[in-house]
Design a protein with these regions (language model features):
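Positively charged n-region of N-terminal signal peptides that target proteins for export
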Residues: 1-4
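Bacterial N-terminal signal peptides
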Residues: 6-15
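Short, low-complexity N-terminal intrinsically disordered segments enriched in polar/charged residues
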Residues: 17-57, 159-160
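A solvent-exposed, acidic/Ser-Thr-rich amphipathic alpha-helical stretch
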Residues: 26, 30, 48-99
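A short, structured loop/turn motif at beta-sheet edges
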Residues: 95-103, 135-141
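A short hydrophobic beta-strand element
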Residues: 100-112
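Exposed beta-sheet edge and beta->alpha loop/turn motif
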Residues: 110-137
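Low-complexity, intrinsically disordered terminal/linker segments enriched in charged
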Residues: 142-160
Length: 160
């Protein structure tokens, strides 16, 4: 009981930081938009700079709880992906904000230029959904968790 009263007193006199207010969806979108632009084939030559613009130097991108890549590794991976899918287009479909966390529902479309994730070349295109959760500090992405339906894309290009 004394602990509860002490916390209330500290909060009342301003010694406990207030909860961080949510940033606006517009501010969140402005912070992450360069990263999503970097995922588009149209901007392939600018992709590394766009990723750097949106991310902190120590940013990590995680495809699992402990499967994370550094910014430089992600930049290299995006370059490879843009070569294998030369018409890749990634669109932001929805932006949700909670504190300094930004969740993006995205959609990617493209046509692989050759064998793709073990699937033989068919000339078919795919459309997939992605969900990304980004933590922002000072307007930069510092940590991201992402999931894309690449197996759904493989099924689409492999369908008879």
């Amino acid at each position: 009981m004394i602990r509860v009263i002490a916390i209330c007193i500290l909060a009342a006199i301003g010694l406990i930081a207030p909860a961080r207010a949510d940033m606006s969806a517009e501010a969140a979108l402005a912070s992450v938009a360069p990263f999503y632009k970097a995922l588009n084939a149209e901007f392939a030559k600018d992709s590394p700079d766009l990723v750097r613009q949106a991310t902190a130097p120590d940013w990590v991108s995680c495809r699992g709880n402990d499967l994370c890549n550094t910014r430089d590794e992600v930049i290299a991976g995006i370059g490879q992906r843009l070569k294998s899918i030369p018409d890749l287009r990634w669109e932001i479909k929805e932006v949700l904000v909670a504190g300094n966390q930004v969740t993006i529902r995205g959609e990617a479309t493209g046509t692989p230029a050759g064998e793709f994730m073990g699937a033989p070349y068919t000339g078919k295109s795919f459309k997939l959904m992605s969900i990304d959760v980004h933590t922002l500090e000072d307007g930069k992405m510092v940590r991201s968790y992402h999931i894309e339906d690449w197996m759904g894309a493989v099924r689409q290009i492999s369908a008879k």
